Amino acid sequence: MFSGIIQEVARVDLIHHYGDSMEIGIFARNLVDGVPGSSIAVDGICLTLVKREFELLFFDVTEETMACTTIKNYTVGSMVNLERSVRLGDEIGGHFVSGHVCGVGTIIAVEKSYMFFKAPTNLVPYVLEKGFIAIDGISLTIAQVRGDIFSVSVIPETRARTSLGYKQVGSHVNMEPDMMTKMQVDTVMRFQAEKIGK
């Protein structure tokens, strides 16, 4: 479990494809307490730290993860968000994030205080005004929604401390809706489907 508060923006230093999977190495200066076996969110994707060589963190990525996230688009030099899993007693500064990416969206516009995204069809029911969403692992509040297009307010501090400062129009991002919102919407939809079926 994660909180959506990014602890470091780090650089992809190594990519090695083998079979249908791949290994990535990320150069992280500040994530000093990551040990092999621990869970770390990389752009909102929950990955297991396989090994560590000083400041270089290594992760194995499965074919399934590559298929449903932006990780397949990484190149050496890509800048990514990192967050270690929360521990008992940690402050939850954002919202609960599972690290299970539900879809890939696209940045369609960038303004001074707002960014606009196109959500994949399967996420649209869960994108609600004033609700939470994790974008590349960042806990953000949805400002406005128009169909599959939504906006979030992004303060300069967020741009500076996350990979959003490196993004541009057309960039793809990982999306995970707020799990509480998803549970509530799914329950209502299931209830309505059962009612119609009777």
From Swiss-Prot:
UniProt entry keywords in alphabetical sequence: Repeat, Riboflavin biosynthesis, Transferase
GO molecular function: riboflavin synthase activity
Pathway terms, separated by semicolons: Cofactor biosynthesis; riboflavin biosynthesis; riboflavin from 2-hydroxy-3-oxobutyl phosphate and 5-amino-6-(D-ribitylamino)uracil: step 2/2
GO biological process, one term: riboflavin biosynthetic process
Keyword presence, Phosphoprotein: no
EC number of this enzyme: 2.5.1.9
Pfam short name (any one): Lum_binding
Gene3D superfamilies: 2.40.30.20
Task performed by this protein: Catalyzes the dismutation of two molecules of 6,7-dimethyl-8-ribityllumazine, resulting in the formation of riboflavin and 5-amino-6-(D-ribitylamino)uracil.
Subunit structure: Homotrimer.
Protein name per the record: Riboflavin synthase
